[in-house]
């Protein structure tokens, strides 16, 4: 009984600590929604590859990225063959080139792949209802550079457009596509990035010390 009480007490302390670290942020250039755009999720884009760079200023410390979400124009069922990869890059926002392999030096990390991806989405510039929950969450440290998304896509089932922002200093894009050729510019898809904050080592030490102190106090009371 004493062991059960102690375990439940420690769990009650740990759960609020963990929950406080789950969050999301909207990556968008100033001005918010500017237009709906079919690059890269629309069928007119065709088979292709798309990159988007996000400024490191979005985050104040290391995070574990758990999801990426985008806002479609229409309420529909969207399907495609998708592969998402992430990495850190020293290439700045607005400086991506259409030679996509030159936009990073750290190898890409596979975070989500589904040849038969299909999802019901809700239309609207602020819905962020097309959600890719990463099967391999990505640890990102903003002190090491900007965040780069690399998407390979094909077999889009419709020419669906998604919310993009105008040019700015938070995000930009580059692409190679069958439908639009190669390009790079200062705009990009507005993205909701889901993440868990990664505690600093000192925080973990303090938490561990607190647990030990609490355990000792409870043990003395139960003796």
Question: Over which residues does each language-model region extend?
Answer:
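A short, hydrophobic C-terminal helix/tail in secreted or cell-surface proteins
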Residues: 199-218
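Positively charged n-region of N-terminal signal peptides that target proteins for export
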Residues: 1-4, 219-223
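Bacterial N-terminal signal peptides
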Residues: 7-16
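Boundary/junction segments of secreted and surface-exposed precursor proteins
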Residues: 19-45
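Sec-dependent signal peptide recognition
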Residues: 2-8, 203-204
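Proprotein-processing/basic-patch segments
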Residues: 28-29, 146-197
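Aromatic- and Gly/Pro-enriched, solvent-exposed loop/edge beta-strand patches characteristic
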Residues: 77-169
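A short beta-strand element within beta-rich, extracytoplasmic domains
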Residues: 63-74, 149
């Amino acid at each position: 009984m004493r062991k059960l009480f102690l375990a439940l007490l420690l769990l009650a302390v740990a759960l609020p600590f963990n929950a406080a670290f789950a969050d999301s942020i909207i990556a968008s250039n100033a001005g918010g929604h500017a237009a709906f755009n079919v690059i890269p999720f629309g069928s007119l884009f065709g088979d292709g590859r798309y990159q988007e760079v996000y400024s490191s200023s979005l985050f104040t410390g290391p995070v574990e990225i758990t999801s990426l979400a985008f806002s479609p124009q229409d309420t529909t069922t969207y399907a495609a063959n998708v592969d998402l990869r992430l990495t850190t890059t020293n290439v700045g926002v607005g400086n991506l080139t259409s030679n996509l392999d030159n936009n990073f030096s750290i190898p890409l990390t596979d975070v989500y792949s589904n040849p038969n991806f299909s999802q019901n989405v809700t239309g609207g510039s602020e819905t962020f209802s097309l959600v890719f929950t990463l099967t391999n969450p990505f640890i990102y440290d903003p002190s090491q550079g900007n965040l780069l998304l690399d998407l390979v896509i094909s077999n889009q089932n419709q020419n669906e457009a998604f919310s993009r922002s105008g040019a700015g200093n938070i995000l930009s894009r580059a692409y190679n596509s069958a439908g639009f050729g190669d390009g790079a510019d200062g705009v990009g898809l507005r993205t909701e990035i889901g993440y868990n904050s990664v505690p600093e080592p000192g925080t973990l030490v303090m938490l561990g010390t607190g647990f030990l102190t609490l355990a000792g106090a409870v043990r003395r009371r139960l003796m």
